[in-house]
């Protein structure tokens, strides 16, 4: 049965009716003017202390507090492609009433029907990320929203490369329900590798991780929320507050230890040795891996951070004009012809935002998104029993190990399909290799549309 509860009072000195109609919160002034109408999912907190009712929520931004704020359920249902959602900002108002306790409890129950309210969040901020606006995103957007939702909030700011990694290696993860990251994808990358390097990596990696966009590309954020709504910190905070976790596979990357020189410049890796004593480093990637042009675009445009994500487009143009060859061997493992069609791959990718934690036997981390599942307070996702005891074990060994290779290299210009179920060397000139696990690596680059 659809919920329909009303409360009479005054708002901004006008007679007001506050209504919860199904999944929509409304405020009607003078019995005729719809001053506020938003999906109940946008409600952060409702508290009553006679005679005042304080309501905190996200609503479309307006220049005047007297202007109406309306976001329909249809607009919210299409939020991944609706620019109206990009205008959401924190909005708080008071209603004067003498009997608001029951109404407040009803709205809060509806607003948090999938996740507990008032949980504990750790925010890690990298002030140097992107254009350098992360501090503003933290102080003016992130903190006020979490505080309005009455979350227990701790904040850590990084000051140097590797800080997020080092902090996460010793973090007491049991103190938090969620970790949020104000910065770019690199900040989250450091944190994941810090959590993965711990003795309790399986448990540490079960805490939900949420990106709050303040970097250059913000690929994970865009992949989760869509490119249309831009870099919306309020939407990201809402995800942290009300999102239900889903699993996201991590990719293991290995490189010879001597590739980094004697200084050991790479701070966040697992350093190990092969059976014959050769050293290598192992780390984890959640988004993309690049060699050649695509790597040069990222690393080679570090000095252009101040121009935002357009730095990648300019870097690509210059790299293509140079067309520098990449002297590497590429070995690939192909499935059988017809294993997956474009249609099935697209459907799998389309369902990514509604996957919950179901995969077994893999090292994985979680990124919170909105999903219709129930989550208990102060608990992580309980997957440790399904993961192997050696979470860092590699199925095909390291970059230093020999692979079971097909005797015949594959020429991609030929009409034949490559051999299946065996490693095959690709015989062609290469300028770049680019692989990934999320669709977008930046707003303007849908690099991997069929990832899932």
Regions found by a protein language model. Name each.
Residues 129-130, 161-163, 187, 217, ...:
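Surface-exposed, flexible loop/turn segments at secondary-structure boundaries
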Residues 58, 424-434, 441-452:
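Non-catalytic interaction/regulatory modules that flank or connect domains
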Residues 182-183, 288:
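Conserved residues at beta->alpha junctions
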């Amino acid at each position: 049965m659809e919920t329909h509860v009303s409360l009479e009072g005054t708002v901004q000195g006008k007679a007001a009716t506050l209504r919860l109609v199904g999944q929509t919160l409304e405020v009607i002034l003078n019995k005729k003017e719809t001053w506020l109408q938003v999906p109940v999912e946008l409600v952060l907190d409702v508290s009553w202390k006679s005679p005042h009712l304080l309501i905190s929520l996200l609503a479309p931004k307006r220049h005047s507090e007297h202007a109406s704020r309306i976001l329909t359920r249809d607009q919210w249902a299409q939020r991944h492609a609706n620019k109206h959602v990009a205008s959401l900002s924190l909005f708080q108002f008071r209603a004067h009433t003498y009997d608001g306790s029951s109404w407040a409890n009803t709205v809060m129950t509806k607003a948090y029907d999938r996740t507990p309210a008032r949980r504990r969040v750790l925010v890690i901020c990298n002030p140097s990320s992107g254009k350098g606006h992360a501090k503003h995103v933290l102080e003016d957007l992130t903190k006020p929203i979490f505080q309005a939702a009455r979350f227990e909030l701790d904040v850590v700011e990084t000051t140097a490369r590797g800080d997020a990694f080092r902090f996460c290696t010793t973090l007491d993860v049991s103190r938090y329900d969620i970790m949020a990251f104000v910065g770019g994808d690199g900040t989250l990358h450091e944190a994941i590798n810090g959590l993965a390097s711990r003795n309790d990596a399986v448990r540490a990696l079960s805490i939900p991780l949420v990106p709050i966009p303040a970097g250059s590309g913000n690929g994970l954020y865009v992949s989760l929320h869509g490119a249309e709504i831009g870099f919306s910190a309020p939407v990201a905070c809402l995800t942290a507050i009300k999102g239900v976790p889903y699993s996201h596979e991590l990719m293991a990357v290995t490189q010879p230890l001597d590739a980094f020189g004697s200084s050991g410049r790479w701070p966040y890796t697992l350093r190990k040795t092969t059976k014959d004593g050769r050293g290598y480093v192992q780390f984890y990637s959640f988004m993309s891996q690049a060699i050649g042009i695509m790597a040069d675009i990222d690393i080679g445009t570090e000095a252009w951070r101040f121009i935002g994500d357009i730095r990648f487009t300019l870097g690509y143009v210059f790299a293509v004009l140079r067309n520098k060859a990449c002297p590497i061997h590429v070995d690939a493992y192909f499935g059988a012809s017809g294993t997956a069609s474009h249609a099935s791959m697209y459907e799998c990718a389309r369902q990514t935002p509604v996957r919950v934690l179901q995969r077994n036997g893999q090292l994985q981390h979680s990124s919170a998104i909105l999903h219709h599942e129930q989550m208990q307070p102060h608990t992580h996702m309980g997957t440790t029993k399904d993961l192997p005891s050696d979470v860092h074990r590699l199925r095909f060994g390291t970059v230093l190990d020999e692979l079971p290779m097909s005797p015949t290299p594959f020429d991609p210009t030929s009409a034949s399909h490559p051999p299946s179920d065996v490693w095959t060397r690709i015989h062609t000139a290469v300028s770049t290799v680019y692989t990934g696990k999320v669709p977008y690596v930046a707003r303007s680059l849908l690099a991997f549309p069929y990832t899932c």
